[in-house]
Amino acid sequence: MLSLPHALRFLLASDPDALTLVLGVVYRAIARHLINQAGLARATGATGAVTLVQRFGSALNLNIHFHMLFLDGVYLTEGANSPTFRHVAAPGANELQALVEQIAARVGQVPGTSRPDRARHRERLAGVRRTTRPAG
């Protein structure tokens, strides 16, 4: 499971394109890590995952987060032979911390997710709220 900072949760809840970009960044970072750990290159290794984007917490509070299940290894896809599976050992605490930091840095580079971008997004939403009148 990957939780996100509160400000980013609000942004992603209201911007499906940004949510898609962030999910892609997370997937690619983990897949690349697995492929590298297997000693393969992206051209010769492939992994897979299933992701559930959960939008609410148990108290029905807004809580965008990802539940991701990755293969515990990589398929070697080189040549005409059938793909061969290579198991990758579970990451240690330091390795996991480095991967989380890498994901955080990359998510911060996604357009719309930096602090100034989030501030502009809040201003835009506030403007929409001010100009929207209840029907009736």
Regions found by a protein language model. Give the residues of each.
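Beta->alpha loop/short-helix hinge microenvironment recognizer with preference
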Residues: 1-136
